[in-house]
Amino acid sequence: MTAFKIENETIADGFYACPAVYEDAESITGLLVRTAEWLRDRGSNQWSGLLKGQDIHDITGSIEKGHVFVFKKDEELAAVVMLLPAPSEWDRTLWGDDGHEESIYLHRLAVSRRFAGQGLGARVLQWAETGIHFPEKTRIRLDCVADSDALHSFYRRMGYEFMGADASGYHLFEKEITAE
């Protein structure tokens, strides 16, 4: 199990954060697949593997390791995020060999369409920065498809620095956070 401390369980009016449990796996997978369908319908291939039954981030295994966090309102799943305290093989491929010891890797941030348009994605991202503490971690890293200008703008507005693009079509972003 990963060492972390949730500093703030409440992220917005009635929304709260908690580690995902095994019983959440089906609803999380459903949310991720619905998000992938929504992205596909808008011309994006981001997360398209989920539509083929591929789960490169192993949601169930990641839940068991304590890497997945859910955001609920009145017990309804509103959003999800995966925070890896060590790089996956995917992350090592994208980021190379440097900076892993002090980095958290953010994956699979998704908001239920029912709660879209309320700033929940930004609040989840802010929570990942300040609402949870991973000892000795001083930055968050994330990647996204290169062809999503809206997503790139969102991350920049949230204070993430564009670190470059890799040859396979992903843009890399990171943000310094406070470690104690």
UniProtKB/Swiss-Prot annotation:
Cystine residue pairs: none
UniProt superkingdom: Bacteria
PROSITE patterns on file: GNAT (PS51186)
Presence of the UniProt keyword Acetylation in the record: no
Enzyme Commission code(s) on record: 2.3.1.-
GO molecular function, one term: acyltransferase activity, transferring groups other than amino-acyl groups
Keywords linked to the UniProt accession: Acyltransferase, Transferase
N-acetyltransferase domain location: 31-180
A Pfam family of this chain: Acetyltransf_1
Presence of keyword Transferase: yes
PANTHER family documented for this protein: AMINOALKYLPHOSPHONATE N-ACETYLTRANSFERASE-RELATED (PTHR43877:SF2), AMINOALKYLPHOSPHONATE N-ACETYLTRANSFERASE-RELATED-RELATED (PTHR43877)
Family per record: Belongs to the acetyltransferase family.
Protein known as: Uncharacterized N-acetyltransferase YesJ
Lineage: Bacteria, Bacillati, Bacillota, Bacilli, Bacillales
Gene: yesJ
